[in-house]
Amino acid sequence: MAASRWARKAVVLLCASDLLLLLLLLPPPGSCAAEGSPGTPDESTPPPRKKKKDIRDYNDADMARLLEQWEKDDDIEEGDLPEHKRPSAPVDFSKIDPSKPESILKMTKKGKTLMMFVTVSGSPTEKETEEITSLWQGSLFNANYDVQRFIVGSDRAIFMLRDGSYAWEIKDFLVGQDRCADVTLEGQVYPGKGGGSKEKNKTKQDKGKKKKEGDLKSRSSKEENRAGNKREDL
């Protein structure tokens, strides 16, 4: 009996000590309300840092944003800027000839990309157009003109210039070639040396039509005269 009493007292003391330890560990009442509701971050607590994305997982949009950030942070030379961000070259009006409107266009297109369309005469195939325009591009390259060429049809190509102020000089070279039918530049069509065959064929066709019309008229007048003579005889 005495042993069981001592065992009961030991269990009660052990439970009391555990309860006291639990009360000491618990926060005082009202502290939770002062700190805020659970799950709401404290204003003084800085937000967790966003984990950086691995560069190996970058997509095109991430690379574009990174490049844009570099452009903002670094001083980029004017020549390396995109064309739409480059400042326009100042126009010296003292060098403009009022009698030549093309001189104004040359000044305004300086340093800007410009394209012109070139048509090859003689109804060529796309391969022939490639060969002919390649020769023209080579001649321009030897004359220190930076020109890029793109075939856009069986008889048509685009010549693209980095500096549009030289476009009219290149146009003058192209229209002087034997197989150049025409050059389209800034909405203006310039006939080439090779475009004359079309005009000749057109004039020949017009002459043939006029000759046929004249023959028909002469035949009809002769028939009318014959009919008139027959009536007089009757």
Swiss-Prot record:
Chaperone specifically assisting the folding of beta-propeller/EGF modules within the family of low-density lipoprotein receptors (LDLRs). Acts as a modulator of the Wnt pathway through chaperoning the coreceptors of the canonical Wnt pathway, LRP5 and LRP6, to the plasma membrane. Essential for specification of embryonic polarity and mesoderm induction. Plays an essential role in neuromuscular junction (NMJ) formation by promoting cell-surface expression of LRP4. May regulate phagocytosis of apoptotic retinal pigment epithelium (RPE) cells. This is LRP chaperone MESD. A motif (Prevents secretion from ER) lies at residues 231-234. GO terms for cellular component: endoplasmic reticulum; plasma membrane. Residues 165-204 are annotated as: Escort domain. GO terms for biological process: mesoderm development; ossification; phagocytosis; positive regulation of skeletal muscle acetylcholine-gated channel clustering; positive regulation of Wnt signaling pathway; protein folding; protein localization to cell surface; protein localization to plasma membrane. Residues 54-70, 196-234 have a biased composition (Basic and acidic residues). It comes from Homo sapiens. Keywords: Chaperone, Disease variant, Endoplasmic reticulum, Glycoprotein, Osteogenesis imperfecta, Signal, Wnt signaling pathway.
